[in-house]
């Protein structure tokens, strides 16, 4: 995932900044699971989402991650993506928009999305892992 800033971003990252890399599994039941290669496992490197097919080769993803910094929960991050699979079915690419929220200190409200810490948009690409 590579950042691509716009004037409306909150705390934008410079264009071309590597946001994340890792592995993802999209399941037939419409769920998705990702392991981040850029985040320290101690700070939370696993997240999940749901996807929906919108045409023959296009899918949308609604993905949630829990953001941690040095062992402290900082809040939820919502990643929305639009994915296009190539004709071989072995590669995909797309665009994403991520909003990272500040966690509220009130117990039971850890997923509140009231205070935006950062908003990031960008592009990504992936290659299917096979047994060959």
PLM region spans:
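Tryptophan-anchored aromatic micro-motifs
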Residues: 1-14, 49
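A short gly/proline-enriched turn/hairpin at secondary-structure junctions
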Residues: 8-14, 34-41
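Flexible, membrane-facing loop/turn or short amphipathic-helix motifs
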Residues: 10-13, 69-72, 103-112
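Alpha-helical assembly-interface signal, strongest on the long, hydrophobic N-terminal helix that forms
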Residues: 12-21, 27
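Well-ordered beta-strand positions in beta-sheet-rich domains
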Residues: 21-23, 48-50, 78-82, 119-125
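Structural signal for glycine-centered tight turns and loop->strand junctions in beta-sheet-rich domains
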Residues: 24, 28-32, 57, 89
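Contiguous, well-ordered beta-strand patches that form the walls/edges
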Residues: 37-98
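Edge beta-strand at a domain terminus
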Residues: 98-132
């Amino acid at each position: 995932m590579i950042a691509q800033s716009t004037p409306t971003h909150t705390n934008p990252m410079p264009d071309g900044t590597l946001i994340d890399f890792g592995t993802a599994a999209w399941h037939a039941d419409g769920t998705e699971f990702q392991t981040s290669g850029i985040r320290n496992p101690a700070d939370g490197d696993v997240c999940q989402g749901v996807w929906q097919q919108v045409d023959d080769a296009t899918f949308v993803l609604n993905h949630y991650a829990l953001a941690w910094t040095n062992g402290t929960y900082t809040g939820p991050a919502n990643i929305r993506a639009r994915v296009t699979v190539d004709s071989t079915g072995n590669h995909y690419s797309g665009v994403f928009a991520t909003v990272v929220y500040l966690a509220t200190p009130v117990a039971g409200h850890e997923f509140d999305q009231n205070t935006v810490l950062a908003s990031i948009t960008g592009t990504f690409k992936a290659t299917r892992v096979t047994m060959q």
